[in-house]
Amino acid sequence: MGKEQQLYYGKHGTPQKYDPAFRGPIYNRGCTDIICCVFLFLAIVGYVAVGIIAWTHGDPRKVIYPTDSRGQFCGQKGTKNENKPFLFYFNIVKCASPLVLLEFQCPTPQICVEKCPSRYLTYLNAHASEDFEYYKQYCLPGFQKNKGVAEVLRDGDCPAVLIPSKPFAQRCFPAVHAHKGILMVGNETTYEDGLGSRKNITELVEGAKKASGILEARQLAMRIFEDYTVSWYWIIIGLIIAMVLSLLFIILLRFLAGIMVWVMIVMVILVLGYGILHCYMEYARLRGEAGSDVSLVDLGFQTDFRVYLHLRQTWVAFMIILSIVEVIIILLLIFLRKRILIAIALIKEASRAVGYVMCSLLYPLVTFFLLCLCIAYWASTAIFLSTSNEAVYKIFNETSCPVAGKTCNPETFPSSNESRLCPGAHCQFAFYGGESTYHRALLGLQIFNVFMFFWLANFVLALGQVTLAGAFASYYWAMNKPDDLPAFPLFSAFGRALRYHTGSLAFGSLLLAIVQVIRVILEYLDQRLKAAENKFAKFLMSCLKCCFWCLEKFIKFLNRNAYIMIAIYGTNFCTSARNAFFLLMRNIIRVAVLDKVTDFLFLLGKLLIVGSVGILAFFFFTHRIRIVQDTAPSLNYYWVPVVTVVIGSYLIAHGFFSVYGMCVDTLFLCFLEDLERNDGTPERPYFMSLTLKKILNKTNKRQAEA
């Protein structure tokens, strides 16, 4: 070993020494990072305890049903409000009060009703007429007409006026509509407030602005929901096609890796080329059509996305984007053509490994199931925590009152001193909260819930990586493949990971979870600072977000390679991470080229599958396939099922290719270890396949002599 090589190895660690007893993943190993395993166990116990406490105190009905002024649910079965699903506000104009922002509740009485008002009436006109029976259903429960008009309105027993309303999110909002740009309720632009004066409709709009502000969004959501109801089975068929294509692609890759890779590259180029041609054809077709030359800036945001497809500028933008992607891919292929040949050989070797461990293709289902459990537990715990507050009642008054905002009891309030001090004040439900230790700790429990979700989700992913790495490492280090391959390598690797390395997996996933929680906090702070004018704060926030994004990517890369070393040697996390990092640094050129070129080829495979299924879905849902033209459902937005199929296809393809990616990474690290451990002599033969030896001009001397 030369002096320069000694200095180089000293800088990036020392290579693994030759061990004649080494034949792949070590079976006689001990537990690693035990203290982290203990911490994970305690954290899970605490997480379960938090879930039990949340389920004990929580009430998801608070999310589903609106509540009246006494905190009673509207429309809930088994209660007196079972047939009253809608919440009615006595004076919705009060919802524009600043108190709404402070207390998250309108300072006006609210009751549950069977249906929203459909008539315009005032209490002044209705109390002495036959309309009173209709009006009475919008008064407080149990109201009797034994008071004067002034007393009834002062005590808030009945609303001063009924306005035609429509339900939204189980709440009654004024049925405001626009006629020639003028806001109206019914045929009127003003309304009588029931107290002898007339007010402008805009005051109602201000009070109900949250509902009117999301009216278009609600219509969009309803149309999207309708599209899902009539196209869900076709979406499932599209996802099944994506799964079959992914599986077929991987099976063919085992036997025709070289041809498939080049066919894949050509197909991606052709798909992008067709996309460019289609954009140009649409651009040419719209020439001369009325309104097609309007710019995207002038058009602004539209909830009906089909409007954008009638603009020539939209298709020009699509064509430019696709052309740039096409040129970038072609240039990369030209400059990396030699390295692609080496990557193809690595993929062929990975194909053989996957072929001998076929059950590895099903392991993503295990990861998916465990991740679903993590997500379900996190989501349910979050809902129960957010609904575990107690009903808090506050004193509300339309005029100034010294006790306004104080906590009160609705049962005893009518006879209390506060009621006599402020005539006309109401003790009504304000929000859900509490003064106990548990309620004060709710924010901390929610943060803990998020943290544990990240930790457990990363642990599940780490378990999958170690399991696959152990199985594929067993394949590589088998001298006579597949005869020396152990029985059930995947199950053996899974058992070793759980039995010996739970602590190491917990350590690696903990580091990643901490960084991810910090990124979530930074995103939250960034949203809060968007309205700020402090440019330095915005710059600092952008720098922090960028730094932690890079840190997360680096930790993911380091963890992935550390897990491979753990699967092979059974060392603890820090030792494995250090050895993997130094091994990669000693072979940085191979890492930068071979590994990344392989990742690029896998990305092209995903694009081919997603593009093929996406184009098929596009032609089907736009009724452009004549054979099934009458079978395709009629939709409000054809892009709803198309986008769903595209996203689902990508996730399915990613699941299959993730197994392949882990196989390539594992074989690559084993290959680097093989080059450093062995020299091809009869005492230290190479374990790599004949194909890899041929590419690298390496031979075992006994074979060469033969």
Curated annotation (Swiss-Prot):
<feature type="topological domain" description="Extracellular">
    <location>
        <begin position="278"/>
        <end position="315"/>
    </location>
</feature>
<feature type="topological domain" description="Cytoplasmic">
    <location>
        <begin position="481"/>
        <end position="504"/>
    </location>
</feature>
<dbReference type="GO" id="GO:0034229">
    <property type="term" value="P:ethanolamine transport"/>
</dbReference>
<feature type="glycosylation site" description="N-linked (GlcNAc...) asparagine">
    <location>
        <position position="187"/>
    </location>
</feature>
<feature type="transmembrane region" description="Helical">
    <location>
        <begin position="34"/>
        <end position="54"/>
    </location>
</feature>
<dbReference type="InterPro" id="IPR007603">
    <property type="entry name" value="Choline_transptr-like"/>
</dbReference>
<feature type="transmembrane region" description="Helical">
    <location>
        <begin position="505"/>
        <end position="525"/>
    </location>
</feature>
<dbReference type="GO" id="GO:0015297">
    <property type="term" value="F:antiporter activity"/>
</dbReference>
<feature type="topological domain" description="Cytoplasmic">
    <location>
        <begin position="337"/>
        <end position="364"/>
    </location>
</feature>
<keyword id="KW-0325">Glycoprotein</keyword>
<dbReference type="GO" id="GO:0055085">
    <property type="term" value="P:transmembrane transport"/>
</dbReference>
<feature type="glycosylation site" description="N-linked (GlcNAc...) asparagine">
    <location>
        <position position="417"/>
    </location>
</feature>
<dbReference type="GO" id="GO:0015220">
    <property type="term" value="F:choline transmembrane transporter activity"/>
</dbReference>
<dbReference type="GO" id="GO:0022857">
    <property type="term" value="F:transmembrane transporter activity"/>
</dbReference>
<keyword id="KW-0472">Membrane</keyword>
<feature type="topological domain" description="Cytoplasmic">
    <location>
        <begin position="254"/>
        <end position="256"/>
    </location>
</feature>
<comment type="similarity">
    <text>Belongs to the CTL (choline transporter-like) family.</text>
</comment>
<keyword id="KW-0812">Transmembrane</keyword>
<keyword id="KW-0597">Phosphoprotein</keyword>
<dbReference type="GO" id="GO:0016020">
    <property type="term" value="C:membrane"/>
</dbReference>
<feature type="transmembrane region" description="Helical">
    <location>
        <begin position="257"/>
        <end position="277"/>
    </location>
</feature>
<dbReference type="GO" id="GO:0005886">
    <property type="term" value="C:plasma membrane"/>
</dbReference>
<feature type="topological domain" description="Extracellular">
    <location>
        <begin position="621"/>
        <end position="638"/>
    </location>
</feature>
<keyword id="KW-0050">Antiport</keyword>
<comment type="function">
    <text>Choline/H+ antiporter, mainly in mitochodria. Also acts as a low-affinity ethanolamine/H+ antiporter, regulating the supply of extracellular ethanolamine (Etn) for the CDP-Etn pathway, redistribute intracellular Etn and balance the CDP-Cho and CDP-Etn arms of the Kennedy pathway.</text>
</comment>
<feature type="transmembrane region" description="Helical">
    <location>
        <begin position="600"/>
        <end position="620"/>
    </location>
</feature>
<feature type="modified residue" description="Phosphothreonine">
    <location>
        <position position="14"/>
    </location>
</feature>
<protein>
    <recommendedName>
        <fullName>Choline transporter-like protein 2</fullName>
    </recommendedName>
</protein>
<keyword id="KW-1000">Mitochondrion outer membrane</keyword>
<comment type="subunit">
    <text>Interacts with COCH.</text>
</comment>
<dbReference type="GO" id="GO:0015871">
    <property type="term" value="P:choline transport"/>
</dbReference>
<feature type="transmembrane region" description="Helical">
    <location>
        <begin position="639"/>
        <end position="659"/>
    </location>
</feature>
<feature type="topological domain" description="Extracellular">
    <location>
        <begin position="526"/>
        <end position="563"/>
    </location>
</feature>
<feature type="transmembrane region" description="Helical">
    <location>
        <begin position="316"/>
        <end position="336"/>
    </location>
</feature>
<keyword id="KW-0813">Transport</keyword>
<dbReference type="Pfam" id="PF04515">
    <property type="entry name" value="Choline_transpo"/>
</dbReference>
<feature type="topological domain" description="Cytoplasmic">
    <location>
        <begin position="1"/>
        <end position="33"/>
    </location>
</feature>
<feature type="transmembrane region" description="Helical">
    <location>
        <begin position="458"/>
        <end position="480"/>
    </location>
</feature>
<keyword id="KW-1133">Transmembrane helix</keyword>
<feature type="topological domain" description="Cytoplasmic">
    <location>
        <begin position="585"/>
        <end position="599"/>
    </location>
</feature>
<feature type="transmembrane region" description="Helical">
    <location>
        <begin position="365"/>
        <end position="385"/>
    </location>
</feature>
<feature type="glycosylation site" description="N-linked (GlcNAc...) asparagine">
    <location>
        <position position="200"/>
    </location>
</feature>
